Amino acid sequence: MSKQPVISRFFKPIARKEVTSEKGVEKEKPVDLDEEKHNEPATTSRLMPKGFDAAAETVTDEVIEIEVEIEHESEPKIEIKNGTVTAENKSMDFAEKLNRIWNDKKRVISNNDNDDSDGENDTIVKKSKNNSNKLTPLDQQVKDLKLLHMDKILVIRVGYKYKCFAQDAEIVSKILHIMLIPGKLTIDESNPQDSNYRQFAYCSFPDIRLKVHLETLVHNNLKVAVVEQSETSAIKKNSNASSKNSVFERKISGVYTKATFGINSAFSSNRKNVLGQYNSIWIINFSEIDKINSSFFMISVNLNSGEIIYDTFECSTTSIENLETRIKYLNPIEVLTVSALPEKVKLRLHGSNSTILLKEKEDIDKEIMEEINKSTKGLNLSAELFELVPVLYKYLTEYNNEELLLISENYKPFASKKHMVLNAAAIESLGIFGEEGGKGSLFWLLDHTRTSFGSRKLREWILHPLLDKKEIEDRLDAVDCIIHEVSNIFFESLNKMLTNVPDLLRTINRIAYGTTSRKEIYYFLKQMKSFSDHFQLHSNYLNSQVVSNDGRIHKSSALLTNLLTEITSGLKEINIENILSMINVSSVMEKDTYKQVSEFFNLNYYDHAEEIIKIQGNINEVKNELAEELSSIRKILKRPHLNYKDEMDYLIEVRNTQTKGLPSDWIVVNRTKMISRYHTPTSRKLIEKLQYQKDILYQETQKEYFQFVKRIKNDYFALNKIINHIATYDCILALASTSQNMNYVRPVLTDESQFIDAKNARNPIIESLDINYVPNDVNLSHSAGKFLIITGPNMGGKSSYIRQVALLVILAQVGSYVPADFMKTSIFDKILTRIGAYDNLLKGQSTFKVELLEIQNIIKNKTENSLLLLDEVGRGTSTEDGKAISYSIVDYFINLPVCPLVLFTTHYPFLGSINSKILKSYYMDFVEQKKEGEDWPSIVFLYKLRSGITDSSFGLNVARLAQIDKDIINHAFSISEKIRQETETANTMNLPILLKHILSSNDLKPQQKIIEILNLQNDSQEL
């Protein structure tokens, strides 16, 4: 059998426009291939003809050489020049056939859409003398769009691909590592090289990769707009004549940034962490109080949680600690401002990867302004804060998220009398979150939540420890109740159910914004229905144990009783089953977008189905006409059992050996070696009519879907309340899981102020890392001492101990059990820390300046009910200056009318000798050892807190642990001993002079002279 030419890649569907054929020879003039740039195929989801492969329409040069195998002795070389196929030998029949195929191919492009610039051709079109300066229709459309949106990267659908053009393409190609097709690099053609090209440079990627690439682009802090076709080819053909020859209309379908990507994009239901879930959008303004201080007015929006935080705070030219704290809490990614911010504030915001956008105050629609007034009524917003709301509303309209600002229940103040605010220094130094909540943080220790929205609420709880004793007790009661009831089938089933719950809070907010997908809304309703079924199934248990006054849960936990009661009543109020029945489940699972949209509703239950049913009737009529046409075709071909090849393209297949007697007006769609496929003129018109009706159905079901979403949105408040109650339950469950750890105990809260008493307490974070942690007691009170001086060797556990105390207090006030045998504590309104040594090059601050600024902030913000942690203050400067500053700070606090509780670690032992009733001295215990070959004493850390003072930091022991050479350490020890002896000698010589000065002083009373002499004696003994 002879070989046939291998040219199957040319067999693609021919144009939908009528093309007649006589005896296999096309009556069509040659088409100039140079004009076939960017020809636009229709898109998927009824926007692209079925079977059309735009990617295959690439023309790579003016001359294309195709090597083929045929049965002749010499293999011919076939060339395609300017759209005409020629051959070098006798195989002219084959060349003629190939020429016909090539012309068919060109008609696919030209007839699909008369736009000569929307195709998938990756041809580099260089400008020639004959070429016009005029842009192609697609490029002109791109230019018009881009000039209106210069602040965005435009990702534009063209057929089965998304493309970026000009300067956008240059940026995107570098980030995504995809090919850049040369062309004009600037949209305004300002680049001198642009004159060499006829079209814009571009890069492209398949439409199925949109979400992946979109996430990458916004992760690089780009603002990206996705542009989609807003009309179909069928509707275009049936529209007015003036638009038929133009490009497809395109509109921006969505705008995305890092802050908006998570809420405006659909993800799989089991995805817990979403890009931007903790990020927020700020709008901020300020006014100067004086030359040093300024008031800042801020509104923060988290689109995922729906929270709107408003706040007024002060910053100075020397300290922006309040701004630091709010950045830690709210993670701004976009910051709007109506006036230029101070340079220090801008620098800090840029340091947190925030994009700062200057916005003008604009007048907005009167009706919207009334809605804003209504939603903010009762919040007592200052005039400075209120004027920011319309600016933020205007900005959010670009992302279709502006509706959030009209929900009054979402507004919350940053600070409240109900909870503590941990400042930025405390969050950092106590390891509250670590690296994004990673291993070794308090959040990691407590986060046993099963849902993503529960995890976010737990994060809020940790950042906002409670200040109200009753609320703390309510949480602890709920934790107790869960621990005892967890094995009950109601809780066991509910807890298991939570492990597979999607992010319901994110979904309900997406419903409010109108951006949710069909699949997502189905799973949302299905999940809410599951909760409803579960509570209904266990209604007897809930009535007897929760609702009844004699029930175990009712008696043991008011918080849990309230949660379960309100969830039950809320689920009954919303007829979720009725709403869910309106959805055709099979369509949700469809991969075909058209079917997913057009068949979404169960028309037996959907109560606005009249128009949809009418259009479906029109579609069925056309299908009946196609069936009648098939009967006529059967008679012509004398094949009574003939059927269309499929019910998509409605093709008639005829063997090539039987094509001679076919009607001349039948349209060849494509051919293979064995068969040819045809449309009749009637079937072609009916197919176009059918496609038009299908597109109308698509649009109608889209419209009805948005109305369906609005119906669910009407129950936003009730659904949001239920979801927040479920999140609270999830947090209680997480605290119960933590509290069941070995040797955790429920803390006892006392009304007595300034009191902590803990037995065998441990650092919860260090212990959770499977480290054998040595427990220590904590005793702070009026009688036991309110100011603890803690000395001891380097790495002896001083810093871990003071962190442990703060973490115990946070756990207790969050509502968790604590790692101790016993703990009794008062409630603290603030935890202020100065821990660690580091500089801040970004702010131009040295280690010592950072220290002093933090001390200044502590002194400014402390109250008598605060807990202060001061770790080795004065280490950032010389020894003498460090001693002086440390002494002054200790002296300041112990002489306050009411000194707060202070834990002060130091390497200056003399501070422990300060005479004060509230000051107590402790050290971290150790054992000295002498090893062979070492001149200095080695130590073994015992990590046990002892009463008293140690006179050495044993820094050389740390050098040994760091594996410094022994000779170097021995030499360092000899120098250290020499300096110590010289210092002792100098002080001994000065002792008589100091004694004489005290005794001869007329300013001191006899009792004061005795105290000074005793202090002098203590100092000399220490030295």
Curated annotation (Swiss-Prot):
- Give the GO molecular function terms: ATP binding; ATP-dependent DNA damage sensor activity; double-strand/single-strand DNA junction binding; heteroduplex DNA loop binding; Y-form DNA binding
Q: Does the keyword Cytoplasm apply?
A: no
**A cellular component term (GO) from this record?**
MutSbeta complex
Alphabetized UniProt keyword annotations? ATP-binding, DNA damage, DNA repair, DNA-binding, Nucleotide-binding, Nucleus
Here the segments flagged for biased composition (Basic and acidic residues) are: 19-40
Domain of life (superkingdom): Eukaryota
Instruction: Tell me the segments the record calls region Mispair-binding domain.
Output: 129-259
Residues annotated for ATP binding in this entry:
G792, P793, N794, M795, G796, G797, K798, S799
Task: Tell me the GO BP annotations in alphabetical order.
Answer: meiotic mismatch repair; mitotic recombination; removal of nonhomologous ends; replication fork arrest
User: Where is this protein localized, as stated in its record?
Assistant: Nucleus
Purpose? Component of the post-replicative DNA mismatch repair system (MMR). Heterodimerizes with MSH2 to form MutS beta, which binds to DNA mismatches thereby initiating DNA repair. MSH3 provides substrate-binding and substrate specificity to the complex. When bound, the MutS beta heterodimer bends the DNA helix and shields approximately 20 base pairs. Acts mainly to repair insertion-deletion loops (IDLs) from 2 to 13 nucleotides in size, but can also repair base-base and single insertion-deletion mismatches that occur during replication.
- What family is this protein classified in? Belongs to the DNA mismatch repair MutS family. MSH3 subfamily.
Query: What is this protein called in UniProt?
Result: DNA mismatch repair protein MSH3
